[in-house]
Amino acid sequence: MANFLISVDKTLRHEGGFVHVKATGEVAKFGITVWFLREIGELPPAPRTDPARPTEISFVRRLTRDQAVEIYRRHFWERYRIGEIRDQDLADKVFDLVVNTGPGGWASIKGRRVFKRGALVLLQEAVNELRGKPLLDCDGILGPISLARVNSTEAGALLDVLRAKAADRYRSIAAANPPLAPNLHGWLERLAA
């Protein structure tokens, strides 16, 4: 079992303090956004298109590191079963990618079902690639079958393939969304860390 405190410490080195980008409406601290806090019930629900309210901005500004760690534990580490990955380095990277890209799988966006290639989908794809056949459904769910395959695959090789797949994903995001292209260098540096 991987150690959550090691993983979250590494991720928090990349996630900065309080951020309020007025042009986009993004408000976050320790990488935790107003929109995510709404989704998990820490703030009243509102459409994602609604800008952050002054009370929400104050709430995020007051968020402590300990509170952020607990949110990451419950809503990322435990929810997606990352702690059941045996190799610490692999668990660290999977956790950081889930925080940065989401888990992946089917999502509802503006009333449409959309498949997203997030961290857990990329991990499942990496296992299949290394095994040379589609052993896993790439659905973004880290269930018992996926965990068994992840834990029985050589961790160093799996980490290398996962990083390559994530780098390709970041490049495709930047190419499809020119306003995000300036973030590509930072995403790739974080991925290599």
Q: Language-model features: where?
A:
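Cell-wall polysaccharide-cleaving catalytic domain and substrate-binding groove, primarily
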Residues: 1-193
